[in-house]
């Protein structure tokens, strides 16, 4: 499942609901070409690993406060959280790395 976060309170609620699962925060922008390219792979992976992974998309233009909190400077940036703790982060539309990091952390 891929869910687009509306604001900080929404993100906090989603993180609480995802307790025990790997959370992938996808920081993106609607105008970002690489973000659009990686999006179908992210949907595919969220379906493939639905029992263990929650994908939360964060539009950096709509949720600037969240992007600032996570020090996001380029898109897409993926932040991986487990039980509220960051376990990995990388920037760029690298589908292989995205899949590898998910598999390594579920």
Swiss-Prot record:
Recorded GO MF terms: disulfide oxidoreductase activity; glutathione disulfide oxidoreductase activity; protein-disulfide reductase activity
Annotated disulfide bonds: 32-35
Biological role: Participates in various redox reactions through the reversible oxidation of its active center dithiol to a disulfide and catalyzes dithiol-disulfide exchange reactions. As a reducing substrate of peroxiredoxin 1, thioredoxin 2 is preferred over thioredoxin 1.
Thioredoxin domain: residues covered: 1-106
Domain of life: Eukaryota
Record site: Contributes to redox potential value: 33-34
Assembly information from the UniProt record: Monomer.
Active site as annotated: 32, 35
Keywords: Disulfide bond, Electron transport, Redox-active center, Transport
Transmembrane segments: none
GO cellular component: cytosol; nucleus
Gene3D superfamilies according to UniProt: Glutaredoxin
Family, per entry: Belongs to the thioredoxin family.
Site label Deprotonates C-terminal active site Cys, positions: 26
The protein, known as: Thioredoxin-2
GO biological process: cell redox homeostasis; determination of adult lifespan; response to oxidative stress
Pfam families: Thioredoxin
Classification via InterPro entries: Thioredoxin, Thioredoxin-like_sf, Thioredoxin_CS, Thioredoxin_domain
């Amino acid at each position: 499942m891929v869910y687009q976060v509306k604001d900080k309170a929404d993100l906090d609620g989603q993180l609480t609901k995802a307790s025990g699962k790997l959370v992938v925060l996808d920081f993106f922008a609607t105008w970002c070409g690489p973000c659009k390219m990686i999006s179908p792979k992210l949907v595919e992976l969220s379906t493939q690993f639905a029992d263990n992974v929650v994908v939360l998309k964060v539009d950096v233009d709509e949720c600037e406060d969240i992007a600032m909190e996570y020090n996001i400077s380029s898109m897409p940036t993926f932040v991986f959280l487990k039980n509220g703790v960051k376990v990995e982060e990388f920037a760029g539309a690298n589908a292989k790395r995205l899949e590898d990091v998910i598999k390594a952390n579920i």
